[in-house]
Amino acid sequence: LLLFFPLHSIQAVQDVNEEVTNDLSGYSNKKHQSEINNVKYSKKNIDELGFILYDLIQQRDFDVINKIIDNYVSHKDHDKELVKYIYSEKAMLNNEYNLAIRLYNEILIHKPNMLLVELKLARALTYVKHYEAALSIYQNIKTKYSGGISSKLVEYIENKIIYLENKNRWQGMVKLGSSYDFNLNEASNSREMYCFRSKCMNSSNQSIAGGKWHYYIKSTKRFPLVGNHSGLLSFGAFGLEPMKTVTARKINIFISGGYQFENANTKIGILPIFEAKWHDNQYYNLSLGGKIATEYTLNHRVTILGDFEYKNKTHPHEYSFNDGDKWIYSLFGTYLVDSQLVAFGGIHGANREKQRNSDSYSQYGIRAGFLKVTGLCDFLVAVGYKQTNFEQFDVYLNVKRKDQNRYLNAQVTFDKNKILTFTPSIYFNSQVNKSTADIIYSFKQSEVGVNFTKKF
């Protein structure tokens, strides 16, 4: 569930006012005000107006700045670099990062040793995902101003260097867990019996309970190309080990790699897909295809995510009737209600073509929920509905199958309580599937489980 929306949205709001401006305001007031407002004027009132404008920048009071800056610029002795700095800060406030970057660079051409402007430039480059350029600036600052800046500022710069260096290192996640299905049963309340070619089956309300162990491993590496462009390689595995015979042993191995574009508010990935599956220690199928993943940040509150995926599935001879194509698509949005609450929702669907039209289907669904962050834990809830329509009448089932599935997912994550560096979480899943092929495919299921997750 956590894959359906970007959890960094909450953290971004919590951190947005702790960036360079707050960390450096006191430092810049003392050391760099005189550099930006180099007193070269013969008229005292212009000097004073320049200092007033700089103080207003520190207070982020652009309404007042807009009222007086025209008078300042109209004077022939105004400080052109101060004006550029004002416009660059205003551009940052309006998310016009490329304009701000251009103005910061123009200032540094004339005044190359302005620490505050260098830091602001590095921050702006990070916003537009020019990670390598931002890293180079921070490393240059660390060398150039070694011994001449406060310990707090040194710590800030070192943290930024570590953050940017990690962008091009292997990153991933390991998840270990266990779950228990405590009322997996058939949903039909009747004692129906269905017979076909001398073989019969009947409905039962007897619950089937059982547990399973599961693991998930994924690792991803970014390979910088130029500017906003990069390559991406990802691989991992998912496994399920049943405690009883309720479910089969499963192993999925996947590899993908391709191209990624990122800027301040857009991310686009084009990724080939290789996926192999094993069931009960036997090879089950191979999927080859590709995926287009997009993410667009409309503003600091709204993010839209869209995916389109294609796979061609091939099976061993005994399962070759499942060979065919699968298309998967989704469109989701997240809304940041406040610094501790994110709401999300969207639509998703799939089309599956198999050798038999009676096994081929189209599926569509809707999902909505929220994530609440508290001092004790993070609480995630999602509800959804999906409908699956099969293409043709199934002579074996004596019906044209149509399934309707309703589900609830809830998870509590104790992010501040590590166990051997792993983050614990508990979850509950419940679903009811109602099918026109009632005897076989209607069921109810409830599951409770625990996960231990480590990110690296």
Please provide the spans of the model-predicted regions.
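Short coil turns that delineate tetratricopeptide repeat
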Residues: 77-78, 112
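Classical Sec-dependent N-terminal signal peptides that target proteins to the secretory pathway
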Residues: 1-12
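Amphipathic alpha-helical repeat scaffolds of TPR domains
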Residues: 44-51
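Gram-negative and organellar
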Residues: 12-37, 53-58, 63-66, 86-95, ...
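Flexible helix-coil transition and linker loops at the boundaries of alpha-helical arrays
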Residues: 37-39, 71-76
